Curated annotation (Swiss-Prot):
It is found in: Cytoplasm. This is 5'-nucleotidase SurE. It comes from Legionella pneumophila (strain Lens). It is an enzyme of class 3 (hydrolase). A divalent metal cation binds at residues 8-9, 39, 91.
Amino acid sequence: MKILVSNDDGVLAPGIKILANELSTLGEVKVVAPDRNRSGASNSLTLTQPLRVKQLDNGYYSVDGTPTDCVHLALTGFLEPMADIVVSGINEGANLGDDVLYSGTVAAAMEGRYLGLPAIAISMVGDNIQHYETAAIIAKQLVIKLSANKLPSQTILNVNVPDLPLNQIRGLQVTRLGTRHSAEPIIKEYDPRGRPIYWVGPPGIEADAGAGTDFFAIKTGHVSITPLHLDMTHYKLFDHLSNLLNEICIEN
């Protein structure tokens, strides 16, 4: 098996090394990841300048681009032969609910799926993460399962793991995305010359976090596994929207 590993925390982040080491027992692992932390990069591609790649002493490839750049680069000619699966992570921090819209970790997995491969995004939930090995072992088991049981097209798995020893994990739960309240206000500060600068505020607190959500699974000590679909079309709105549009008169 050939496994492509990427992330958004950067090629030197602890999570990616632990993940790659664990997956190496399944086959050939190639790591292609950003040269620095690119959290929040979402699905952005670098289109206005070339990408530069450096191979590190450990064999990992460091790219001066986004997580999506890394996977796109790896799967469209940089790496031969083609990988069999993409695993993105292990992210230092949650990717729950609305987080998936901004997450570079999830975006890297999405890019793999766009390019035809099964893909998993995996994140640790907590501060000052201590138990990356837990997520790595779970990722390995999921890769084994997906190698024998293919996901439907345009589907990835978004996996969130509590920062606990493996023997304290209460099980795996299939979940839906919860939601957060709106983000906190921006944080205004001043640079040494007295000019205003702005930081994006913290994410909003949980809004929809009841039973069945990814938030709830984590709170109860479970691993959350959310199947995400890349087709964002809202099919149930077709009839209602068509009726609204029929009321619009467009004259030449």
